[in-house]
């Protein structure tokens, strides 16, 4: 979507096709979202609010049978304003999928004749009324076979000005006695490994010191554990990426966050950086730097 014009995205379509889900996704993408705006108020809303937000999305659904003429009139009027790019996104789904969704939620479509008519009749009448809007739409997304994750990615690919952020990893060392990091996705406890704390000449230093690092990493039990950890992560990380994860935080903890966790985190960051962007944080190291 053009960057030199303010962006107005109009989200409409079949009831039950996912407008509420899309509204939440657009908010995550930085849009200011207004739900259930009557079509006749679209122009007035834009006049009063266009200067406050660069990206605006309005969700409009079927309320009256003049819906499509009102909406098209408002869109045509807005397009006469050279400072706005009005885009219509139409959400659709097959009749059988919509019927199944309505039965699951125990709700009725707007044109179901107050519950007296057949569910499918209401859906088909709504589809007929919305056809002019569908034909006028810039984008049509059929959600019949889309998971919520797939739908969000399709929205990002189509409407986000940042697209999808590249996947990255943060490796963090920490000390359990200072509390676990609350933002970690994976936490590994390495307190079972040999502890340099009990080696007097190593005690004052951290895992950033080569002597401490070599002591920890050259132990057989460390090498066995580390290889299994690396194998696990190399198996799991592609799955996180597939699920849409943009940043994965891996926390390695020992008692004080000074020796073992720092050493393991250093090696892990080094190995993972061969495939992925990696940042490393040693949460407790500043506690042990001699001043």
UniProtKB/Swiss-Prot annotation:
Record key words, sorted: ATP-binding, GTP-binding, Nucleotide-binding
Gene3D superfamilies, alphabetized: P-loop containing nucleotide triphosphate hydrolases
Pfam families tied to this protein: PapZ_C (PF22740), RapZ-like_N (PF03668)
UniProt-recorded Gene Ontology molecular function terms: ATP binding; GTP binding
Binding residue positions for GTP: 61-64
Keyword Nucleotide-binding set for record: yes
Positions that bind ATP: 13-20
InterPro entries noted in UniProt: P-loop_NTPase, RapZ-like, RapZ-like_N, RapZ_C
Family to which this protein belongs: Belongs to the RapZ-like family.
General function of this protein: Displays ATPase and GTPase activities.
NCBIfam families in the record: PRK05416.1
Protein name: Nucleotide-binding protein lhv_0732
